[in-house]
Amino acid sequence: MKNILVLCTGNSCRSQIAEGYLKQYLNGKALVFSAGVNNHKINENAIKIMKEDGVDISNHTSNHVNEYENINFDYIITVCDHAYETCPAFYSNELTTRIHKNFFDPSSINNSSNVEKAFRKCREEIKKFCYDFSKKFN
């Protein structure tokens, strides 16, 4: 079975959303993990907007990338530029496929009336990315 790591800055939003969709779309074809180069509490808005789409991430935990240093990953997917630039080299080898896609950080929105809209926009972008990835996955 293949191992996939989704990496972000804080493992609080974008990587959690991607982990949820990848698990759903791959349906047991791979082990999917998410982590952050720093770890923060999972963003409640991420949990809420995923629940709207029928994906429950409320039981996910926020993990630091160092927790996975002994796992050989087949894919490392970075979902923000900061994680891409700071991802430790020991998480990949010559067989690891690295994929980078910088998604907008909805938690950076401070205007409360636009927060849910920003999270939904981010969710839909990540959902499409994960769906497309799952269709090419082998």
Please state what every model-predicted region is.
Residues 1-68:
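Conserved active-site segments centered on acidic
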Residues 12, 81-84:
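Short glycine-rich anion-binding loops that position phosphate/pyrophosphate groups of nucleotides
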Residues 34, 78, 99-102:
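Structural signal for conserved beta-strand scaffold positions within catalytic alpha/beta enzyme cores
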Residues 38, 61, 83, 99, ...:
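Glycine-rich, flexible loop/turn motifs
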Residues 39-41, 83, 105-107:
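Residue-level detector of flexible, active-site-proximal loop/helix-junction positions
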Residues 57, 83-86:
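Glycine-rich nucleotide phosphate-binding loop and flanking beta-alpha elements
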Residues 73-74:
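Local beta-strand N-terminus motif with an aromatic residue
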Residues 86-138:
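Phosphate-binding/catalytic loops
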